[in-house]
């Protein structure tokens, strides 16, 4: 995503656009079904892709804060904000590609937003369950999840610094769903589960919130977050060894 000064071009003419996104050919991820309808409206405004990402970040953090209340109403409201956050997380890439404003910096900002919202959500959820139940174990599970997510994010950032990239475009959202060539079955299963659940995680949260069952995410995430960063490092080490 280039500097926002490029956004002074006429928005009404849209002559500089590559075009709005087309209707998704696949049902999943479900968030794409929402984003492709919202993106054309965003393209009629001066809002740039980085601003869409920033709005997604703010909505996600607010939704995470709402979860700290620990009540049924807070869970549903917080879930709706998380849903908006995830929808805009798809929109920013669509806006960037439509306007030809994709960049490495925009991709890194998007990755940061994903990490920040996910980490804040589990911290908010854990605090909320602890607040209502009085059992501190839920807070420790949230901290374990946040730790695992942060380690994995740091591993990715370290890899970005080491690896040189030839193009400056943001990775398309469809590419995020591509399955890596990993011979290890366990690593592959963890990767697929993490990637697909991440794409529509907001719907999982909303569904569980309607039944006051979001607490089940905490023990699952506390274990899964550690497994994913271990697999991520394992995958990168194997790839580095194969390139030598």
Language model segments and positions:
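A feature for the membrane-embedded catalytic helix bundles of lipid/isoprenoid biosynthetic enzymes
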Residues: 2-39, 111-244
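Short, contiguous, helix-prone interaction/anchoring segments in small proteins
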Residues: 33-34, 39-53
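Helix-capping/transition residues at the boundaries of transmembrane alpha-helices
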Residues: 42-44, 96-97, 208-209
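Membrane-embedded alpha-helical segments that form the functional core of polytopic membrane enzymes
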Residues: 46-105, 122, 141
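Active-site His/Glu-centered metal-binding helix of metallohydrolases
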Residues: 87, 91, 95, 108, ...
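Short helix/strand-bridging catalytic loops that position acidic/His residues to coordinate divalent metals
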Residues: 99-112, 129
